[in-house]
């Protein structure tokens, strides 16, 4: 008769402690509580948005209803000779946002690296960067329209809103690099370019991720503002068009799509952050 093999014994030293398991359960409960509160808040908002206009507590002409958004979306899906499909409008806005967002990050990193490399240049440009970042960029929409034309003025607006804050954020991240790491690299004979690429840039990954999160919203704002003024395509144009003909269903549908687009972009960057931070 064959002998039944005993189950392998789990090393008690490798088993998670009771305190750790309790902490994990508490973390899961907290996450579920937060998600539940977020969902409840959204539901309360939607219910109030639906009920208050129907009860004539607020004027439905100025708010529309959540229940009207889906029929409006379906209606706008069909392209007409006078109006493009809402999917075309959405794609136009997303494309312009991605272009402006990417340009702001690439130029922001390059300019911040130049300012880190030449500290004298930073001392000269610092007040101008601060003033440029503080200026209301919407005042430049007509100027960009004259300089760049209807299409490229939207990209210019997106870049203008997000570039300066990107430069300042990333430069401050570069300056916050641990000086002991820089001294250690210098001790081993690292050149300035090696210090930048091997020490400063890797050490500034959290700042770069933070700049990505800030930029995705700013770039979208810049695109929508540009579309208000100079476009005949995009969600910003659709909002402007709907408000001019007093069709709040169109306005609210476009705003809802903007909220969904910005949320998806933010989630994509959060996923990228999780991947990068795991590999550090």
Q: Whereabouts are the PLM-identified features?
A:
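Transmembrane alpha-helical segments of polytopic membrane transport and secretion proteins
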Residues: 1-41, 267-280
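Periplasmic/extracellular loop-to-transmembrane helix junction in inner-membrane transport proteins
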Residues: 24-27, 55-102
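Alpha-helical membrane-interface segments at transmembrane helix boundaries
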Residues: 33, 87-99, 122, 129-132, ...
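Short hydrophobic, aromatic-rich alpha-helical segments embedded in or entering the lipid bilayer
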Residues: 64-75, 230-243
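Transmembrane-helix boundary motif in ABC transporter permease subunits
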Residues: 99-129
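Transmembrane alpha-helices and adjacent helix-loop boundaries
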Residues: 135-140
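Membrane-cytosol interface at the C-terminal ends of specific transmembrane alpha-helices
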Residues: 150-215
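Hydrophobic alpha-helical transmembrane segments of polytopic membrane proteins
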Residues: 236-273
């Amino acid at each position: 008769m064959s002998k039944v093999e005993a189950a392998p014994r789990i090393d008690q030293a490798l088993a998670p402690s009771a305190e750790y398991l309790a902490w994990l359960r508490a973390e899961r409960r907290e996450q579920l509580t937060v998600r539940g509160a977020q969902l409840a808040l959204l539901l309360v908002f939607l219910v109030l948005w639906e009920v208050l206009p129907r009860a004539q507590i607020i004027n439905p002409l100025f708010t529309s209803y959540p229940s009207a958004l889906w029929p409006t979306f379906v209606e706008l899906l069909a392209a007409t000779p006078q109006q493009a499909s809402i999917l075309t409008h959405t794609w136009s806005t997303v494309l312009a946002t991605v272009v402006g967002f990417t340009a702001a990050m690439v130029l922001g990193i390059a300019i911040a690296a130049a300012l880190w490399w030449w500290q004298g240049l930073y001392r000269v440009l610092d007040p101008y960067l601060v003033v440029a970042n503080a200026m209301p960029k919407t005042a430049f929409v007509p100027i960009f329209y004259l300089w760049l034309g209807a299409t490229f003025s939207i990209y210019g607006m997106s870049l203008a809103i997000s570039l300066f804050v990107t430069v300042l954020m990333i430069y401050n991240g570069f300056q916050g690099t641990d000086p002991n790491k820089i001294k250690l690299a210098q001790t081993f004979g690292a050149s300035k370019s090696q210090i930048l690429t091997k020490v400063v840039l890797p050490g500034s990954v959290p700042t770069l991720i933070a700049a990505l999160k800030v930029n995705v919203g700013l770039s979208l704002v810049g695109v929508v503002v540009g579309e208000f003024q100079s476009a005949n395509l995009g969600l910003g144009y659709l909002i402007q068009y709907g408000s001019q003909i007093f069709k709040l269903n169109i306005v609210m549908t476009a705003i809802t799509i903007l909220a969904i687009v910005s949320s998806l972009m933010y989630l994509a960057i959060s996923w990228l952050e999780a991947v990068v931070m795991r590999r550090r």
